[in-house]
A protein has these predicted regions:
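Helix N-cap/capping motif at the beta->alpha junctions
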Residues: 36-42, 65
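Two-component/phosphorelay signaling modules centered on CheY-like receiver
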Residues: 10-35, 74
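Acidic di-acidic motifs
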Residues: 8-10, 86
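CheY-like receiver
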Residues: 45, 51-125
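Non-catalytic signal-transmission and effector/linker regions of two-component phosphorelay proteins
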Residues: 1-5
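Conserved sequence signature across two-component system core domains
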Residues: 7-8, 37, 54
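Conserved binding/recognition cores within well-folded domains
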Residues: 114-162
């Protein structure tokens, strides 16, 4: 199951994205658990590191999606972020937060379906047994398969990964 967060202040756009995802799920047999947030502040406050994929609007009242993505990256380096926006000019900044893609509004199911396979391939890189490790106030997800060995020095634990 892929856990998805949709952060979109426009209810119609959020529901349209949810409908497109549900149609894809029914057609391809991929199960989604979708949570919706109408603003970035609420999303960040409630974020528990369980999302695999975040669809983030950029232009929202209060904290915009780009600022929210920067804060999200401070907490979770591996979650897949996709911007859903009519503001293509933010593309360069999106790469600074390692955005997987940009989907331009208004949403189009055909164009979305062309991109979703590539997006889900990034999500699959997060799958598998993993552990969450806190370091310097940040949480990191480490895939068990990527751990070569673990070293203990005093009270420090060092993970050596591939």
């Amino acid at each position: 199951m892929v856990k998805i967060a949709i952060v979109e202040d426009c209810k119609e756009e959020a529901l349209k994205l949810q409908d497109i995802l549900n149609a894809y799920s029914a057609r391809e047999g991929v199960k989604f658990d979708i949570s919706m947030y109408d603003n970035a502040d609420k999303f960040l406050f409630e974020y528990d590191h369980s999302a695999d994929l975040v669809f983030m609007d950029i232009e929202m009242p209060g904290m915009n999606g780009m600022e929210a993505a920067e804060k999200l990256r401070e907490e979770d380096e591996s979650v897949v972020i996709v911007f859903v926006t009519n503001m293509a000019g933010f593309a360069v900044r999106g790469y600074q937060v390692d955005a997987a893609d940009f989907i331009v509004k208004p949403l189009n199911a055909y164009e979305f379906n062309l991109k979703i396979e590539r997006i889900l391939s990034r999500v699959k890189m997060r799958e598998g047994p993993s552990i969450m490790v806190e370091s310097d106030g940040k949480l990191y997800r480490i895939l068990a398969d990527s751990i070569r060995y673990i070293e203990v020095e005093g009270h420090d634990v060092i993970f050596h990964t591939t």
